[in-house]
């Protein structure tokens, strides 16, 4: 089944500063949606609005036309990978996979070193290895939509390439929205692109527009 996620009618301010205003962004099954924007332009805030982490009545978030009125999200609808590590440090690696109901053997087929770390606690892993676990769990979850905030941070180029291939496979079953400062990776993997600028969103129909905005040379 194809699904459609939309957000618009956003008004987000912190004090007297407007963060987001004229916004419309959509994600759908079968597509990866990349979002560009300078530091402080509201990319993370936008993902948090979609995920319900920033409470404001001045927004409309819809899945298949049905408004999501509560601030909490059904994990079957949406999962989010934040910029910071989010898994509890005291749990074992295998326990995280059991909680998300994700195949650990499949994970190890991509990242073989984890076969020796099955019962290691998360706090014993490096930040990069934790990121690998968390990103895989979100992408392989049963959610209709995955929101990824800086998914390539702390990853080696090899692991970035692995996750780009995983995203290409997973998008057949879900919609994926991602932001990242590694702009070339975002343009290479995305089907749709948006730029956040001056509190508004702009859909990029021509890749050369990204040169005008200063994201590509």
Language-model features, listed with the residues they occupy:
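Conserved structural motif at the start of ABC-family nucleotide-binding domains
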Residues: 5, 19-22
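The feature captures the beta-strand-to-loop junction immediately N-terminal to the Walker
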Residues: 36-38
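Helix-to-loop junction immediately C-terminal to a conserved catalytic motif
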Residues: 51
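ABC ATPase NBD coupling module
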Residues: 54-55, 66-79
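Q-loop/switch helix immediately C-terminal to the Walker
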Residues: 80-105
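Walker B catalytic motif
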Residues: 150-151
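Conserved beta-strand-loop-alpha-helix hinge in the C-terminal portion
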Residues: 200-217
């Amino acid at each position: 089944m194809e699904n459609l996620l939309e957000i618009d009618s956003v008004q987000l301010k912190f004090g007297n500063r407007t963060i987001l205003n004229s916004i419309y962004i959509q994600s759908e099954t079968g597509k990866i949606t990349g979002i560009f924007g300078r530091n402080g332009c509201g990319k993370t805030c936008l993902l948090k609005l979609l995920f319900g982490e920033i409470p404001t009545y001045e927004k409309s978030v819809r899945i298949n036309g049905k408004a999501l009125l509560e601030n909490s999200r059904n994990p079957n609808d949406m999962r989010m990978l934040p910029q910071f590590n989010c898994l509890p440090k005291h749990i074992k690696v295998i326990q995280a996979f059991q909680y998300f109901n994700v195949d650990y053997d499949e994970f190890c087929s991509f990242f073989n070193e984890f076969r020796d770390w099955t019962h290691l606690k998360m706090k014993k892993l490096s930040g990069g290895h934790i990121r690998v676990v968390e990103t895989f769990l979100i992408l392989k979850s049963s959610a209709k939509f995955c929101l990824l905030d800086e998914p390539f941070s702390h990853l080696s180029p090899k692991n970035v390439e692995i996750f780009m291939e995983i995203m290409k496979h997973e998008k057949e079953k879900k919609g994926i929205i991602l932001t990242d400062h590694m702009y070339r990776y975002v343009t290479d993997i995305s089907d749709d692109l948006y730029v956040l600028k001056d509190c508004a969103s702009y859909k990029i129909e021509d890749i050369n527009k990204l040169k005008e905005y200063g994201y590509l040379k």
